[in-house]
From Swiss-Prot:
Gene behind this protein: ndhK2
Primary location group: membrane
GO biological process assignments: aerobic respiration; electron transport coupled proton transport; photosynthesis, light reaction
Annotated cofactor note: Binds 1 [4Fe-4S] cluster.
Cofactor(s), names only, from the UniProt record: [4Fe-4S] cluster
Entry protein name: NAD(P)H-quinone oxidoreductase subunit K 2
Membrane topology field: Peripheral membrane protein
EC number: 7.1.1.-
Keywords: 4Fe-4S, Cell inner membrane, Cell membrane, Iron, Iron-sulfur, Membrane, Metal-binding, NAD, NADP, Plastoquinone, Quinone, Translocase, Transport
GO MF annotations, alphabetized: 4 iron, 4 sulfur cluster binding; iron ion binding; NADH dehydrogenase (ubiquinone) activity; quinone binding
């Protein structure tokens, strides 16, 4: 048998450092594991097909040939277990909040969230008197990029995707799990909603501020303006007394 031990030793333990030729230096890229990992994810962001209101119509417009979001490597997925991006397009209600948190928890790491539209970010036009709207999706799940608007244009979604890719390019995959932990969130899938009294009642008509005009207006017209739209028992009695006096006269 041939003795290949000397040749094997020279292969594994060369006497001198091999030189890198010019042809090899032009075809080899030196990088780090982080950069390689992030580079592979930049062009393979898979969003979850998720929408609750009118903002999703703008997101659905990206699928057409006019915008063609496939050139960004976006592949819409119907299952959260195959997606790494969720775009919350639309209003989030208290009843749907547990489902959203469950979808987020089912997505594999690393995962990202884009809050799209005013209703998702602050509650939008439902933020003042709606007892069922969540005032900001970031109270439920961590958000990476916000897209203001009502609704935002498809170009704004592309801008958010570009900003998200820039954020992904500078991440260290060993640190992300610690920075976005759910420890600072007060909501979980097992959270019990606290019942809130209905603010839409007729009692506001009887408030003191609704019974008379503002002082500045009353002083300007030199009279009080009752704003009560319902007749009180005292007013009904005064009206009846006046009708009796008119009948006697």
């Amino acid at each position: 048998m041939f003795n290949d031990r000397p040749q094997t030793d020279r292969m594994f333990f060369p006497p001198e450092r091999p030189e890198v030729t010019s042809e090899l230096s032009n075809n080899v890229v030196l990088t780090t594991l982080n950069d390689l990992y992030n580079w592979a994810r930049l062009s393979s962001v898979w969003p979850l097909m998720y929408g609750t209101a009118c903002c999703f119509i703008e997101f659905a417009g990206l699928i057409g040939s006019r915008f063609d979001f496939d050139r960004f490597g976006l592949v819409p997925r119907a299952s959260p277990r195959q997606a790494d991006l969720i775009i919350t397009a639309g209003t989030i209600t208290m009843k749907f909040a547990p489902a959203l948190v469950t979808l987020y928890q089912q997505m594999p790491e690393p995962k990202y969230v884009i809050a799209m539209g005013a209703c998702t970010i602050t509650g939008g036009m439902f933020s003042t008197d709606s007892p069922t709207t969540v005032r900001g999706v970031d109270k439920l799940i961590p958000v990476d990029v916000y897209i203001p608007g009502c609704p935002p244009r498809p170009e704004a979604i592309f801008d958010a995707i570009i900003k998200l890719r820039k954020k992904m390019a500078t991440e260290d995959f060993r640190e992300r799990y610690d920075t976005i932990a759910q420890t600072h969130r007060y909501y979980t899938a097992a959270h019990r909603m606290k019942a809130v009294a209905d603010p839409l009642t007729s009692e506001y008509i009887r408030l003191e501020s609704r019974q008379a005009a503002p002082p500045a207006l009353a002083a300007a017209i030199e009279m009080g303006i009752p704003l009560d739209l319902q007749r009180t028992p005292q007013l009904e009695e005064q009206i009846r007394d006046g009708e009796h006096r008119d009948a006697r006269a």
